């Protein structure tokens, strides 16, 4: 009571001087607070080690300070009075004095409480006598709150989101991010766009240390301690900086031998005496051996072997057991034979038996049995007992064994591809007109095979050569035969000079090449041609013996002069093909039997011949001149070689992958080549692209004899032994990045078949989209 009243009087006395002393009291309070906090932080000055027990601190100041302690013993200082608070307390006490008895009762209650606290705290006698005691009281726990609400332990973390350890991206499509302890949705915080994030990155200085909590979606700012911890972990150091990594080693068990052993008990007497139990066991075993009761291991094995008897095993494993494949990983089983069909029956239905045509085709593929649909010819018997022994049984078994152990096996994934997807999307033929569609005229007059045909450069006349040893000149518009020139041998090839200023036809008959003036067309042109071929020019160069023995130039005799023959070039072997250069001064001939002199080049103006090759690269079948460049195309049976006539070197070798080449035709621009083969194929070569075929066309059923490009229109035609002439669209673009467009247009099949031969030669009209074809039926047909 006295202490409380003294405090009140002191407050009243200090009222007039509050403003004057405020600054001095504030400085003194700050010094006292720092001293008290330093005393709290220093563990050596703690009055007790027990947590949760009220502790007392002493101070010389008359002001009262209270400290609150948490469960871990950390204290927080709280000032109880200041200059402003003292004014408020003094004013409150004056009001209380005016109230009277009510204030006195409250004072008495406060004295009782202070006495009870003093009796519980029990401060030290020496400190309490000299200084005023300052008590630090622990706050009482509210019974209405949970016991572990304010806990700081890691096991009781304040986790508001109760979804558990799940991927949080499951809540990306929802407005909430989980549920709290009351099963209420935790709404996601507002998310800014990229502009907001950019502004925060610029304006917020703590943006670099801000992370997002995936459980709550809130931005959490990392403290300096967290950043220091992260740096230590990243650098590979121990996270706790207070941990001493290199503490002094304490040898709990020393390596030095001590003088006094821990255990020094002397050995027992039985440790060095023979064991009595072992002695008894050995004596029993000796007695059993003497009596024959006990047997050795070898005797036991011999008795077991006698009981088992002889052991039999199979030389090979059974078919049901899986063979252990050594040295082979992931073995592939052999493919099974196809089950027999109705055609293999001894009495098959009539529709499975071959007719005369099918039998002929089956026998025709004798050299290529793998192309047959059936490897046998179905037969019909009345009964099973009439079926003879199968003569090819051993051969088929032998081939099957060869396939099983010689052919490599591999697993392939079967692709289910729609057939329509593989068919290229081609334009409609109606959009690609004009092209020949019907047969317009038939030129009849030859009595044997018509092997070759050629058209005048202006497109008015037509020349043909036949096996009936005649050369006929036709008028295209009327179909009238204007002139017939008889020869001594079969006419293999005819070629009209492409130069419109000359009227010359080259005729290959036997060993001779005849240069004929057809005497049709302009008379001035005919006379100019006769003047050119009348006299031989002087020879400036001496020809070698190799050329003289291969070819000889001479003027035609009188009887041949009347027929129109002007010059005769005699070769040492039969001529198969003749072709002109684009300018009309050079022409080349092919003699397949001539070995390294199979191809010859003749110059008309100088009446001189050349042998371009000194070595034989194979049997030459066909030659061509490039329409623009000084290049020479030479086709052997399997390959095509392109030579530069100026540099006299090989430029390129085209690989046809065919058995036998029959003919060639080059595009007017000179960048694409069309090749026909006897194995039913046509090959399109893009000379700028590759040495392999750009496209292989199998449009015919039999051997393809001839192919030809049109000079003006994007058309080409092919003739085959299946009596068909197929007209196709072949557009070559100026853009090198765009591939040629090839579209089959029309199949013209009007020729008749004679002795397995059909169409022998095709040629285009130089101006109109018309095509001429010669056949084994001794006719020439025009399609327009």
Curated annotation (Swiss-Prot):
Any one GO molecular function term: ribonucleoprotein complex binding
Key word Ubl conjugation present: no
Sequence ranges of Basic residues compositional bias: 1-11
Family: Belongs to the WD repeat BOP1/ERB1 family.
Biological role: Required for maturation of ribosomal RNAs and formation of the large ribosomal subunit.
Positions of WD repeats: 445-486, 488-526, 570-612, 615-653, 656-695, 699-738, 754-784
Protein name from the UniProt record: Ribosome biogenesis protein BOP1 homolog
Originating organism: Drosophila sechellia (Fruit fly)
Principal place of residence: nucleus
Keywords: Nucleus, Repeat, Ribosome biogenesis, rRNA processing, WD repeat
Any one of the GO CC terms: PeBoW complex
